[in-house]
C-alpha cells in the first residue's frame, strides 16, 4: 500500500516542484 501511495504522490510532488509558488 505504501508503494502505491508513493506512486500516486509522485506526479503530485513533481507538479508541486515544477509549479512556481511564492
UniProtKB/Swiss-Prot annotation:
Listed name of the protein: Polydim-I
Query: Which BP terms from GO are recorded?
Result: defense response to bacterium; innate immune response
- Say which domain of life the source belongs to: Eukaryota
Write the record's keywords in alphabetical order, separated by commas.
Antibiotic, Antimicrobial, Immunity, Innate immunity, Secreted
| Tissue expression as described in the entry | Expressed by the venom gland.
Q: Tell me, what does this protein do in biology?
A: Antibacterial peptide. Acts on the Mycobacterium abscessus subsp. massiliense cell wall. Reduces 40-50% of the bacterial load in macrophages infected with different M.abscessus strains. Is not cytotoxic towards mammalian cells, and shows no hemolytic activity against human erythrocytes. In vivo, reduces the bacterial load in the lungs, spleen, and liver of highly susceptible mice intravenously infected with M.abscessus.
The UniProt entry's GO CC annotations, sorted and at most eight, read: extracellular region
Question: Where mainly located?
Answer: secreted
The cellular location(s) given in this protein's UniProt record come to: Secreted
